[in-house]
């Protein structure tokens, strides 16, 4: 175990990285091996055995997929590396989004037999959104069908990246033995069974020619990144190892290049050079621009540098409920210093909190520390109100960092306790789970009294139900999955709402004239409120009540009671009574006017459309496509990847329930698919009639 002081390395020796990948590219195994070789693990975890460190929730151990991003810290050659494990399954994109917000760099892991797969495209685009510098690791080089250069080429064709291989594999499939370092021009072989002993040797004669050609290709790409080096290169001068690394590092941090390495994590080959590459090419907190925030007092933009003397600023990126110490709030420190036992200000909530303990996490073990500094990723105990996306800062100089956006849920399930004893436990458990996961929404249906949970996909909700049983001991019954339909309007309409009550004593008086109009989808807004009244016909202090009345009415549309979206509400006119007018009266009048206007505005039903990507052997493609056509799907593209076909389609969510079973029988279990939300679109009239009838 390192001594405490070693933990606080200089900032330039700190790396905050994520490991991102398609669901089966071997990300968890890669993380495991990193922890093993950096000395934090004493046995080799194997996902198939279910004893890995970062996959520590029982569901993950069973399913072999990573759901919760656990933050882990380890050391390599005097550098400290904080790793945030991100899930590769599409139902968990919220976890990926929040992990990417707080990372400085990432390792993108690919399966060398497939290269870029559909989910890796999604994660890559999310990383682009946050400008995260990346290096790529072509894993599974020992698998049948592994082809390093084909896999590298997919980075260009599918991701428009600029990959620069800095290694070349020695053999592939069962003959994969090691790698050639094209910068040092040395061959690296792994000698011991567990891969902890490796040695550099001269490049074997039979590979020398190819290695020189590959080095030349690398140098050419490196030279294109820097004017000075380009001149040297064109004049045939020697370019040193240091220069190559310096240029590659700069270009990686600026997102102009992606160094590519290869290996086979499960066979314990290729991990140590990957760790060296994390240090060589990925940024420390000092290499990145200061974090941007908004001053609470006046909304001015301020920047916080990664410096202990700056005011404290941190972003909460995860909340977990730990069975032993309660609520753990994970945060990334951008500036300043925070001691345990001190007060911190949550500027998002406008509340002051005391952080009683600070812990560094090693997957599911934890070590307590006295303070945190810039660049640290830690978890705090004692923060009651803090949630994902909140800013924690110095009370004297409060700022707000930009919030993390999460997508709206698209699928719902009714859920009820199996017995009376489960009733109270269910409420508590759902509260804890929705606090951890911002894409899980919980509500009670006013009419039926049922508890409804909503999320990002079937798997997402299955796992929630599973966790209720295992972690919280709550037995539940669940209904059929329901689509989260929405309602909107196709044309503007006006209406008036008048609420007048005259009973003994003070009456009630509210009067509102409204226009509602559709908001085009591309504006990306679900609601906008505009006050166009003039001459004080309605005093300004009633406007918030009018807006609240409209929002309440929007929760249940006129067609089938689904939430209303993409509507702009404009208050045109109205009147008030000096004595009888109240917020309550205006809220009711606005709600009446809105409901009336909705009826005239040609309301329509919207349904979630999913992007579906199916990977299948060619012989099943005909059956799969004709089945898709029967499900109202639109085929967008057909691609060939090796001996497999990739079908990309847009399909209504309502047509996909139980699709896993259907696809299994259509392809004898050989096809796989991933699905994610794309957009909302109008439901065809005949189908809308059926949905409305059921309601």
From Swiss-Prot:
GO terms for cellular component: cytoplasm. Its main location: cytoplasm. The keyword Nucleotide-binding applies. Coiled coil: none annotated. Residues 12-286 form the tr-type G domain. GO terms for molecular function: GTP binding; GTPase activity; translation elongation factor activity. Gene3D superfamilies: 3.30.230.10, 3.30.70.240, Elongation Factor G (Translational Gtpase), domain 3, P-loop containing nucleotide triphosphate hydrolases, Translation factors. Transmembrane segments: none annotated. Keywords: Cytoplasm, Elongation factor, GTP-binding, Nucleotide-binding, Protein biosynthesis. It comes from the Bacteria. Pfam families: EF-G_D2, EFG_C, EFG_III, EFG_IV, GTP_EFTU. GTP binds at residues 21-28, 85-89, 139-142. It is found in: Cytoplasm. InterPro entries: EF-G-like_DII, EFG_II, EFG_III, EFG_III/V, EFG_IV, EFG_V, EFG_V-like, G_TR_CS. GO terms for biological process: ribosome disassembly. Catalyzes the GTP-dependent ribosomal translocation step during translation elongation. During this step, the ribosome changes from the pre-translocational (PRE) to the post-translocational (POST) state as the newly formed A-site-bound peptidyl-tRNA and P-site-bound deacylated tRNA move to the P and E sites, respectively. Catalyzes the coordinated movement of the two tRNA molecules, the mRNA and conformational changes in the ribosome. NCBIfam families: EF-G, PRK12740.1-3, PRK12740.1-5, PRK13351.1-1, small_GTP. PANTHER family: RIBOSOME-RELEASING FACTOR 2, MITOCHONDRIAL, TRANSLATION ELONGATION FACTOR G-RELATED. Belongs to the TRAFAC class translation factor GTPase superfamily. Classic translation factor GTPase family. EF-G/EF-2 subfamily. This is Elongation factor G. It comes from Thermotoga sp. (strain RQ2).
């Amino acid at each position: 175990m390192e001594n405490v002081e070693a933990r606080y390395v200089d900032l330039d020796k700190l790396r905050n990285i994520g490991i991102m990948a398609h669901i089966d590219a071997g990300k968890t195994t890669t993380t495991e091996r990193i922890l093993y070789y950096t000395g934090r693990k004493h046995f080799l975890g194997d996902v198939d055995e279910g004893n890995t460190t970062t996959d520590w929730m029982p569901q993950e151990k069973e399913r072999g997929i990573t759901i919760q991003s656990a933050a882990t810290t380890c050391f390599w050659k005097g550098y400290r590396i904080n790793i945030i494990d991100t899930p590769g399954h599409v139902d968990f994109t919220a976890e990926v989004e929040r992990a990417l917000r707080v990372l400085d760099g990432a390792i993108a892991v690919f399966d060398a037999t497939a290269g870029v797969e559909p989910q890796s495209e999604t994660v890559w685009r999310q990383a682009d959104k946050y400008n995260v510098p990346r290096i790529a690791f072509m894993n599974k080089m020992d698998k049948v069908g592994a082809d390093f250069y084909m896999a590298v080429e997919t980075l260009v064709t599918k991701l428009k990246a600029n990959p620069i291989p800095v290694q070349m594999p020695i053999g592939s499939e069962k003959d994969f033995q090691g790698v050639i370092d094209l910068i040092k021009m040395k061959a690296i072989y792994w000698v011991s069974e567990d891969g902890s002993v490796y040695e550099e040797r001269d490049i074997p004669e039979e590979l020398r020619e190819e290695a020189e050609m590959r080095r030349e290709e690398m140098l050419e790409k490196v030279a294109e990144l820097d004017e000075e080096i380009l001149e040297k290169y064109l004049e045939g001068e020697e370019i040193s190892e240091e220069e190559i690394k310096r240029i590659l590092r700069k270009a990686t941090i600026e997102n102009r290049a992606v160094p590519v390495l290869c290996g086979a994590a499960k066979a314990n080959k290729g991990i140590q050079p990957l760790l060296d590459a994390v240090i060589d090419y990925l940024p420390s907190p000092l290499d990145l621009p200061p974090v941007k925030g908004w001053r609470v007092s006046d909304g001015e933009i301020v920047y916080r540098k990664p410096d202990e003397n700056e005011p404290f600023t941190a972003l909460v990126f995860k909340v977990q409920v730990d069975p032993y110490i309660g609520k753990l709030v994970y945060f990334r420190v951008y500036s300043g210093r925070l001691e345990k036992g001190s007060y911190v200000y949550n500027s998002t909530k406008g509340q002051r909190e005391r952080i009683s303990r600070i812990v560094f996490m090693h997957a599911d073990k934890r070590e307590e520390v006295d303070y945190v500094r810039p660049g640290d990723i830690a978890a705090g105990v004692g923060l009651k109100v803090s949630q994902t996306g909140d800013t924690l800062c110095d009370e004297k100089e409060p700022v707000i960092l930009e919030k993390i956006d999460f997508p709206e849920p698209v699928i719902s399930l009714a859920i009820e306790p199996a017995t009376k004893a489960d009733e109270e436990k269910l409420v508590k458990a759902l509260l804890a789970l929705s606090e951890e996961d911002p894409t899980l929404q919980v509500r009670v249906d006013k009419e039926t009294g049922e508890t409804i949970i909503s999320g990002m996909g079937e798997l997402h909700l299955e796992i929630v139900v599973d966790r209720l049983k295992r972690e919280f001991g709550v037995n539940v019954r669940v209904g059929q999955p329901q689509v989260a339909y929405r309602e909107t309007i196709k044309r503007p309409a006006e209406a008036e709402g008048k609420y007048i009550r005259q009973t003994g004593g003070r009456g009630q008086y509210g009067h509102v004239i409204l226009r509602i109009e559709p908001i085009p989808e591309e504006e990306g807004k679900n609601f906008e409120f505009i006050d166009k009244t003039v001459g004080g016909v309605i005093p300004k202090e009633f406007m918030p009540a009018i807006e609240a009345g409209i929002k309440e009415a929007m929760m249940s549309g006129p067609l089938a009671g689904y939430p209303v979206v993409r509507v702009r509400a404009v208050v045109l006119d109205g009147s008030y009574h000096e004595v009888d007018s109240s917020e309550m009266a205006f809220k009711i009048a606005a709600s009446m006017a809105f409901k009336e206007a909705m009826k005239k505005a040609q309301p329509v039903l919207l349904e979630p459309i999913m992007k579906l990507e199916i990977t299948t052997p060619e012989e099943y493609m005909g059956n799969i496509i004709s089945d898709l056509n029967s499900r109202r799907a639109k085929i967008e593209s057909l691609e060939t990847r090796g001996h497999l076909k990739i079908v990309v389609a847009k399909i209504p969510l309502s047509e996909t329930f139980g699709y896993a079973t259907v696809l299994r029988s259509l392809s004898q279990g050989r096809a796989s698919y991933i699905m994610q939300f794309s957009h909302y679109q109008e439901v065809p009239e005949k189908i809308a009639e059926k949905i409305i009838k059921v309601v």
